[in-house]
């Protein structure tokens, strides 16, 4: 059962996230042979001020 987690800065519309989840699901099915019903896509909206690569705050 493939789980795909995507972390994005918040601000995408629901329609954008639906389209992304659909395309990611199709890619997982195509490349792994997993049935579509087994693929789970989790999109996490990250508020600004919560991402610190190399210890420095990253913004959009």
Swiss-Prot record:
Highest taxon of the lineage: Bacteria
Active-site feature positions: 2
Keyword terms of this UniProt record: Isomerase
Its EC number(s): 5.3.2.-
Molecular-function annotations in GO: isomerase activity
Record carries keyword ATP-binding: no
Keyword Isomerase: yes
EC category: isomerase
Record field: transmembrane: none
Alphabetical list of PANTHER family matching this protein: 2-HYDROXYMUCONATE TAUTOMERASE, TAUTOMERASE-RELATED
Family that this chain belongs to: Belongs to the 4-oxalocrotonate tautomerase family.
Protein name as annotated: Probable tautomerase SP_1017
Species per Swiss-Prot/TrEMBL record: Streptococcus pneumoniae serotype 4 (strain ATCC BAA-334 / TIGR4)
Lineage: Bacteria, Bacillati, Bacillota, Bacilli, Lactobacillales
